[in-house]
Amino acid sequence: MEKKPFYITTPIYYPSGNPHIGHCYTTVACDSIARYRRMQGYDVMFLTGTDEHGLKIEQKAAEKGVTPKEYVDEVVKTFKKLWSYMNISYDRYIRTTDDYHIETVQKIFKALYDKGYIYKGEYKGKYCTPCESFWTESQLDENGCCPECHREVTEAKEEAYFFKMSSFAERIEKLLTETDYLQPKTRATELVNNFIKPGLEDLCVSRTTFKWGIPVTFDDKHVVYVWIDALSNLSLIHISETT
């Protein structure tokens, strides 16, 4: 009898520094579920990995006097050493600097562009460097700071490519409200109320203000931003490759 597949992933961790108790918490939680499902007879795929591009990595590497790749290589060693020490039973560790991941992301970006789902525009907004996130004025906290880390944000404007997220607003709302796709249900309601009902905005998917990223093949001034870079890691779309 063929085993039923079960896929589980940790967050794809950002290696701007060494792992801490928060990384351990989520990884142990996933490991526990993966082990339980294996005991039940499922064919488990347990993924973890690191999201290794972006401005913060570029800045950290410059502070240390090394290249971004040299910097993340050392931090990743610490992550893997910790998971080995804790006997974490992951099946794959995917790094966004892996050659096969880079090739896959470039193919995805080009395919979306060719199909008209990605277009070039200009982004204006409040930017938080530690979180590598843009925010609208209404999303800032009561002090006008980043709603995630509560640090100061800067005014930013740059040429960028955008994914037509707004075209999928109705489909996403239906998925969140009429299915159990996202649990707990309170999170689904939160997404609908905070992002879809006010008017779902298109998603910035490239950057020009830093170089440490996956180049856009048809426009080398741009690097692919986290929403397509890191999230493609989670999809396991390059499953045929080896780690």
Regions found by a protein language model. Give the residues of each.
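Cys/His-rich short segments
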Residues: 117-169
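Short low-complexity, flexible loop/linker segments enriched in glycine and/or proline
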Residues: 59-63, 107-110, 134-138
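Structured secondary-structure scaffolds
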Residues: 1-48, 95, 100-104, 155-240
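Short, charge-patterned binding micro-sites
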Residues: 50-56
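A charged helix-plus-loop insertion that forms the helical arch/lid used to bind
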Residues: 60-73
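A broadly conserved sequence feature marking short terminus-proximal activation segments
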Residues: 71-127
